[in-house]
């Protein structure tokens, strides 16, 4: 009986040591924090919630005196690294963000090699790419105004072709925000409709 208790105690101790080792290993992994990514991507005062891609997740980075986010598929041929958000824009408002890219230069109007693209509801809106080898394009501010108010599925993706890696090989994104004041809607006024009757009461106030 004593021998059984001893082996049981040893087994429990070994299990606890194993669990502790697994937890420690997990804590040391570089797991991106959504709150940190949101803070890096949003402009001051903006509260957009972003979803990070699982294959090549975006990362928080300090660059050019700002805290921003960069794509995570550097050196991965035929890959895409995307970050997305559901954004509601009212009438009179627009979406604004800063973006930059440092990758393989693209030449020609129709060539799309390594580039950072902005997509809304599955439609390519605009994209940027490097124009010189090992030289970032530089930060640019882009503003998009929808045709009508609504909630839109937005995505920023750094897409790579099958060959050539240049520079930092990534796209950068920062200062995402909905800007502008919502349009004011005039309050409806009641107007007499045809066929309605109105009664006027007269009262004699003379002494």
Region locations from a protein language model:
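Extracellular carbohydrate recognition
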Residues: 77-80, 109-111, 160-181
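Extracellular carbohydrate recognition and processing domains
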Residues: 123-149
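Ser/Thr-rich, Proline-interspersed low-complexity disordered segments
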Residues: 24, 183-195
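Sec-dependent signal peptide cleavage junction
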Residues: 20-27
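Extracellular glycan-recognition surfaces and repeat-rich motifs
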Residues: 28-68, 206-207
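Short, surface-exposed beta-strand/strand-loop-strand elements in extracellular ectodomains
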Residues: 109-122
